[in-house]
Amino acid sequence: MSSTDDTQDAGRRRRFLQGAALTLVAAAAPPGASATENARIVAEDHWARKGAVKLYLYRKRMPDNGPPRPVLFLVHGSSFSGRGGFDLQVPGTANYSFMDEFARYGFDVWTMDHENYGRSSQTQSNSDIRSGVEDLKAALPVVESVTGQKKVMFYGQSSGSIRLGVFAMEEPERVDRMVLDAFTYTGEGAPEIMRRRANIASLTASNFRPTSQASFDAIFARDDPSTVDPAVPKALGDYELKLTNRTPNGTYVDMAIHMPMVDPKRLLCSVCMTRAEHDGNATDAELLDFFSQLPNKDKQFCEIRGVAHVAVLGINRHRIWHVMHAFFTLPTQRSA
């Protein structure tokens, strides 16, 4: 990247940070205070192409009334779509939408449904990690054409963090900083990964597994069901099952037998790793090993109590949102 690009990135962040104090005040407002803000949030549908595959992109932000807002792109995991998981509306319960929360913080928030998820094309592919990386490569030029920003911030959840890690290795010029949440490095000794490894014959026998409401209930019951409101898997199932009743197996296969896929030494940007108190997809030892190898010293590792694997949909989601917001708004380094 050129020094001109670096200067422009620093300038955008400085302009954004000038409003950080106001953002924090808004974030601390009581729940009822956000209703008007939610009504003002602008939502847009966009599309990308990966050959014959149509990829659905979804954007939410506050109305434009100043300099460009920093772009935050959210990468979903193995079991539900981007819009379904990151913009979830839970009847009778406010503030479950990750996208709304960060739009209120001042971000231009994007996500996508990977191939065979949500509103994107339904094909016969198993939608493995490699497929998801190619999805991101198709999506980011669309984001750039709409926002004018080539280099953006990212969040990846579970297998989405693996997709994101591979993408960052291959297209580092597009990644400003990123959060790897519920990441798996090797999976050795992790209960959920060992379960998938033992079930590999079934996972490779078909590119898909059937999905039902019980599938979504099981995701949230797996690690610690006390960390989630039962209304959440019900709302998620209601959304997802209107779009498809199958889930591709590719990422499960990769996580069972193809780890590691991300080389920490090749991640050049600033990285924050977030680790739930209850998460069977990795061990502390493997994640700390990965973290120790990250070359950029502007890095963070945060283990959070009161949350499980899908922390951003847990009762204590506000705690991981706080960590991410602080990381994404970290002031730029001053010269001596």
Predicted regions and their residues:
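N-terminal secretory signal peptides
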Residues: 1-11, 22
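N-terminal export signals
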Residues: 15-35
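N-terminal cap/lid segment of alpha/beta-hydrolase-fold proteins
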Residues: 36-64
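Short, surface-exposed "cap/lid" segments of acyl-processing enzymes
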Residues: 66-68, 72-104
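Conserved acidic catalytic loop of the alpha/beta-hydrolase fold
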Residues: 134-150
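Alpha/beta-hydrolase
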Residues: 192-274
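Conserved alpha/beta-hydrolase "acid-adjacent" motif
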Residues: 280-286
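Catalytic histidine-centered segment of alpha/beta-hydrolase-like enzymes
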Residues: 307-317
